[in-house]
Amino acid sequence: MGAVAVVLGAVLMLSLAWGLQHAALANPPVLGRMAPKLAIQTSGGDQVRVWELQGKPVVLNFWASWCGPCVEEGGVLADASSAHSDVAFVGANNQDTPSGFQAFELRHPHSYPAGPIVTGSYQAFGVGGLPATFFIDAQGIVVASFTGPLDASTLDHYLGLISS
């Protein structure tokens, strides 16, 4: 009987810890606040500073070359960035090697800037898994976030929250 109680107690504690962690990831601390400062450097050497994009809605996508779901959503983001010139799309390459980033860029071309993070961090946004996408309004406020691969209809929903 004592062993059963210990096992049940352990299961309860693990379940509680998992739930608390995932609840925090579902509501990153940046929601409703100014987006933390973040900049990327493209393969062409240009720096894109997300905080300088105020005045235009921003879709900020954290990804990595080794992330299967990131590859899955790549075409959706590329198509949306071409269709929505009123929205700035930025890809923040995360926890990757330079060669992994370069190979990914060659295999999955897109028109929006992407590159490794050179200012700020994914942690400041509360990223707990990849891909993670943040939707920032024209005033620089993080309106929504989504963790996991975006499909076209989900992306359209979130674009509606930041586009006028």
Predicted regions and their residues:
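Thiol-/selenol-based redox modules, centered on thioredoxin-like
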Residues: S15-G19, F135-S164
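Conserved redox-active cysteine motifs that mediate thiol-disulfide chemistry
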Residues: F62-D79
